[in-house]
Each structure stands twice: as structure tokens, then as C-alpha cells.
Amino acid sequence: MGVRLGTFLDDQEELGPVICRNMQKEKSISFSTNTPNASRHMEYYSLSKSKSNRHMEPFFINIAPAPANEYEMSSHEGEEFIIVANGEIEINYGNETYVLKKGDSIYYDSIVPHHVHAYNNQTASILAVVYVPA
């Protein structure tokens, strides 16, 4: 669509720093792929929705297990950084597959088709920072 993900989450804009307290996080959005009957397996919590003129989109994301037939690769301009906070995730990136555990991280060009999902039918949580060029 050519629009950064955070555009749909913006509220009031702040010119200075934005602080997001752990206990005050609000679920911003939850979704999965466009696959018919897909479950909503990813809950996004925006960590910067009121920051004006931002180019990075930091999110805390809870990932529930989802059936493999719901995995649909996506791509967009920019870069992504992910660190696993809890559990394990699997990332399909191009023709490669990576399994990351708590404390592991990955940084990649998001123009390459990719999909992030919980691994081994367990829940997981990640911190993801998405950069989309202006």
C-alpha cells in the first residue's frame, strides 16, 4: 500500500521523546495473513504511536501458534530488526528458514519475502522494529 504500518495506529503526535510504560501498553492491532479463515495470531502493541515524523516502528508482538497452511510470505520496502523476548520463533526468509530462541535476534531487508511465526506450536513474544524509508 505504500504506507507505513504505524499510520493506522497514530493518535496524538508528540514532538519530544515518547515513553511507553510496560503496564500502560494498549493493543494496537491484531491480524494474520489474508488467507481465508486465518486466525488472528499476532497481537501488536505500538511503542511509538504518538511520535511525530518517525521512520522506525517499534512493536511488542505476542504471537500465538497458527497452522502452517496460514503462513503467507510478505515483502515491503525497508528493514526489520527482531529480538525474541519469550519462546521461540521461526522465520521464513526467501528460501531460508531460521529458528530463534529467547535472546536471539535477526536483522534483515524486508523486500525479501518473509514470514514470522511461533515455533513448535508454542506462544512467543518479540520486540520488532520496522524501518520503512520515507
Residue ranges and their predicted role:
Residues 62-64, 75-91:
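Short, conserved beta-strand element in jelly-roll/cupin
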Residues 24-34, 40-50, 57-76, 110-113:
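Conserved short histidine dyad/triad with adjacent acidic residue
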Residues 14-27:
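Long, charged amphipathic helices and adjacent flexible linkers at domain junctions
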Residues 71-72, 80, 96:
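Short, conserved secondary-structure segments in the cores of folded domains
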